[in-house]
């Protein structure tokens, strides 16, 4: 039996002394698209932040293992260098730092973690241009300040550019469809479909179904009150679209354990 690349076992996570995740089990492997759904406040973004090691979220029980290595206590940069990536719901703007400069800093941080020399400017220019073409982003994008004055769609394209440049093994997309019009949503979906493949697994976190009409998931996981309570294939998206989350609440309430798949 093939082991998953990212394995989460009995994960309990707290923030500000409040338990948010209450025993998460989840496997994500390269070559597959996973959708993590659930109503607002169910703990989806907390799970994403815990995967990446955000210091505001404390793992109190359980483990996060990536490619056989326990990363539960690892710093965020270690996780990133190992091949994990997260696209944030609300990317931060950094006035005064160009997209090009930021991307070169990110690449060099990864190279330093592998014990390699900093990338030469001409080599960076080549790989950056290739990534921009792959992500369908105009060349003048690189000279703009990072996310400064960017529209919602442009911020998401910036995340796609990082995907194209870094080629992570597992990409966590935290509500990357939030606030996008249909054209921007199509752009994001096209990028995800372009990059997802045998060498990259994707975990799409959303409480909407619309992006999942454009990016077909292999597996769907539904969260409620800090637990994954339902799992299935892409057909589960249609059920949630038709019925909403009310029936999930009813199933959880009727369960002797108050949860469970």
Q: Each PLM stretch: what is its role?
A:
Residues 175-176, 183:
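Walker B catalytic motif
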Residues 223, 227-250:
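Conserved beta-strand-loop-alpha-helix hinge in the C-terminal portion
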Residues 86, 90, 96-112, 124-127:
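Q-loop/switch helix immediately C-terminal to the Walker
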Residues 163-164:
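ABC ATPase C-loop
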Residues 37-39:
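The feature captures the beta-strand-to-loop junction immediately N-terminal to the Walker
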Residues 6-8, 21-23:
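Conserved structural motif at the start of ABC-family nucleotide-binding domains
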Residues 63-79, 147:
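ABC ATPase NBD Q-loop/coupling interface
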């Amino acid at each position: 039996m093939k082991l998953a690349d990212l394995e989460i076992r009995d994960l309990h996570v707290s923030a500000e002394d409040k338990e948010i995740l209450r025993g998460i089990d989840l496997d994500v492997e390269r070559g597959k698209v996973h959708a993590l759904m659930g109503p607002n406040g169910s703990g989806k973004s907390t799970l994403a932040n815990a995967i990446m090691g955000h210091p505001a979220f404390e793992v109190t029980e359980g483990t996060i293992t990536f490619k056989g290595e326990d990363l539960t206590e690892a710093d965020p940069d270690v996780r990133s260098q190992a091949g994990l990536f997260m696209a944030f719901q609300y990317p931060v703007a950094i006035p005064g730092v160009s997209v090009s400069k930021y991307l070169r800093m990110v690449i060099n941080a990864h190279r330093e973690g592998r014990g390699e020399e900093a990338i030469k400017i001409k080599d960076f220019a080549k790989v950056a241009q290739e990534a921009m073409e792959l992500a369908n982003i105009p060349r003048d994008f690189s000279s703009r300040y990072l996310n400064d004055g960017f529209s919602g769609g442009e911020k998401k394209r910036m995340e796609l550019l990082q995907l194209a440049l870094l080629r992570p093994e597992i990409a966590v997309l935290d509500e990357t469809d939030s606030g996008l019009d249909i054209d921007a949503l199509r752009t994001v979906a096209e990028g995800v479909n372009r990059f997802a493949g045998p060498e990259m697994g994707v975990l799409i976190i959303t409480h909407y179904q619309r992006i999942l009409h454009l990016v077909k998931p292999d597996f769907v996981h539904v969260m409620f009150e800090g637990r994954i309570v339902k799992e299935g294939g892409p057909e589960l998206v249609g059920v949630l679209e038709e019925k909403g989350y009310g029936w999930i609440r009813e199933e959880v309430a009727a369960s002797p354990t108050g949860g469970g798949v």
